[in-house]
Amino acid sequence: MILTRLAAALRVKRCIAAMVTAMAALIALPASAQTEDNWKPETFTLANGLTAVVLPDHRAPVVTHMLWYRVGSADEVKGKSGLAHFLEHLMFKATDDIPAGEFSKIVARNGGQDNAATSYDYTTYHFRIAKDRLPQMMRMEADRMVHLKLDEQEVIPELSVVREERRQTVESSPAAILDEMVSAQIYAGHPYAIPIIGHMDELAKLTRDDAVDWYRTWYGPENAILVVAGDITAAELKPLAENIYGAVPRRGDLKARKWPPVQALAKSVELSHADPKVSQASWSRTWLGVAMGDGDAEALQVGMEILGGGRVSRLYRELNEQGRATMSSGYSMEMEARGIVAISATPAPGVSVAAIEAEAMAVTSKFLREGPTAQELSRAKKMIAASAVFTRDNQMSLAEWYGERLTAGQTVAQIEGWEDRIRAVTAADVMRTMNRYLVGTNYVDAVLLPEAK
C-alpha cells in the first residue's frame, strides 16, 4: 500500500469526521476501562538498537503491532523509483521457515489482520492480533527482518503486480495523475517529487539485486521502531522483544540520509489535467508547509481548520452555503522534510473554475488580513484537540500517530505535548503562520477538468 499526499489528506478528513462519534464512545466507557494506565506510553531500547514504544489499552485482549523502518521512497537513488514499495511487497514472500505467500495466511488463521504501507519517509508493517498470539507474530516479523528469501522466481513476477497497482491506483485516476503533477512541481529537485509507487519505465527495470541491496542496507533493528498498542505493558513486552527481536543482529553501518533541502518555487505554477472520467471540474492551490515537529505546525493546523476544516469553516460558509461550491476544504500536512498546505474547491454547476478560484482566494485573503475571531479560535482548538480522542480510541490510529512522528525524529515527550501546544495557540500565532506560508507566488495551482467533447 502506498501513502500518497492525496490519500493522507483524505485520511485526515475521515479522522475529523469520525471524532464526535469516538468521543461519545469514550465517554460512555465505564470508569474501570478509562484508567490512567490506558495510552500512557512506555519505552525501551534493545542492545541491537531497536527502539520500542508501548501504548497500553486494556479494554480488550488484543494488540496492534507496528514495525516501522526509517526508510521510504525518498531514500531511493535516481532511476530506481518504486524500490521501497516494491520491497514492501516482497516482504510477504518466503523466509527460511515460512513458504512464499503464507505470511498473511498464518496471521489470518490466528484470527488477525496484517498489512503494510510505504511513504516518502518510512515503511511500516503491522498486524492486529489476540494478545496470546503476539509471540508467534513477533517471531514471524523477526524472521523476515533477517531471513527474507528473495528468489528470482518470486521477485520478478511481483514487478508485474506493482506495475498493475500503478495502473489501477494512478493511471486510471485523473485525480491521482494530477496529484503526481503537483508533487513534481512543489517539490522540484527533492525526492518527494518522485511518486512513491515509482515511474512505470523505472519499475520495469528494477531487479532482484536492487531489492536485495535495499533490504540489506535498510532493514535492520538499528533502523527500526516498534510500536505496540493494546492490552500489554512494557514489563510484558520487553522480555518478548529481548528474546525475539534482540536475537536479530545489527546490519552494520547504517547509511545516512542524503536529502537536498526543499526549495521554495521562484514563481507560481499552473497545471491542468483533462480526462473523460471527470464529471465536474475542481481547483486547488498548494503551498509548501512545515516539517514534522516544526514550531509553526500547531498554529498552521489551527489556522487551516478555521479556513477550510469543515462545515463551520470560512470556505464552507462563503462558498458552499452560498451555492458557489459543492465541495471546499483546506488542510496542513506535515512530512519529515517539509509538508504542504492546500485549499481546494469544486464549483457548483454554472460557476466557472476561474470564478471559484477568485472567490476562494478572496476568502483566504480576508482571513489573512483579519485573523480569526475569538469564537473561531476556540472552536478550532477544541475540534483539533478532540481529534486526539478519536486517535486514542483506536489502537491502529494511535500506533500510526506515534510511529509516523517517531520515524521523523520526534521524541515521545514531543508527541505527548502536542495537545498542550494546540491549546497554547493564539490568534497572533495563527496570523503569523498563515501569512508566512499562504502568501507570495511560491504555489502550484491545479485544475482537474472534464475532457472536452
Please place each PLM-identified region on the residue numbering.
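M16/insulysin-pitrilysin zinc metalloprotease superfamily fold
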Residues: 93-97, 128-159, 238, 333-391
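Non-catalytic beta-strand/loop surface segments
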Residues: 32-73, 99-132, 169-222, 247-294, ...
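N-terminal secretory signal peptides that target proteins for export/translocation
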Residues: 1-12
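Non-catalytic accessory/assembly modules
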Residues: 153-157, 173-180, 387, 407, ...
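Active-site SXXK
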Residues: 81-95
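Short pre-active-site segment immediately N-terminal to the catalytic Zn-binding motif
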Residues: 72-80
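Non-catalytic, conformational "gating/processing" segments within enzyme and secreted inhibitor domains
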Residues: 152, 159, 180, 212-244, ...
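Bacterial N-terminal signal peptides
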Residues: 13-28
